[in-house]
Amino acid sequence: IVSTASPDNILLYLPEKQEEQIREIFGGLAERGFPVQNQRPHITVTFAPEMDPHVVELAAELLPAVIPATFRRVGNVIFGTKRKRTVAWLLETSDELEIAARKISAANPEGRGPRWTPHLTMGLRLPREDVGDYLTAMDELTSSHFKELNAVEAAYWRPRTQEKTVLAGG
């Protein structure tokens, strides 16, 4: 179910095999009683309630040169300061993609300036008190060999209209 409040996004998508590996981890977490994660695995470049067309144009200009890209899992990160938290894999990538993503983010009036924290969300809207157990379970369910992720497609995704525009790769 997609909330009508979901923002427009510029996203990076993984190959099917890696998406499947992540969905298997989601399944294992759900079997342990944690909230079901229905989101398609992705890495967000930037988002806005309504994306400025200039930002999409810039992404279409910059991303083809840096996609496909490799990301390394370098740890876990927890977002949020209120009761519900988001747990994600913290990622590192090439300087070239990092620079492009920061330019795209800086061009987004709704963005956070030239900041980008590459991550892949593994748990949305988790109660604060469940985060420790969630991280432990996530580590137990994730193969130690699953260290790299590949971004093979960049797209502009509009949840309200379910429209996906491929900007690079794909």
Task: Mark where each language-model region is.
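A structured binding-face within diverse protein domains that lines the active/interaction site
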Residues: 85, 89
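Basic, often amphipathic N-terminal segments
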Residues: 1-72, 91-150, 163-170
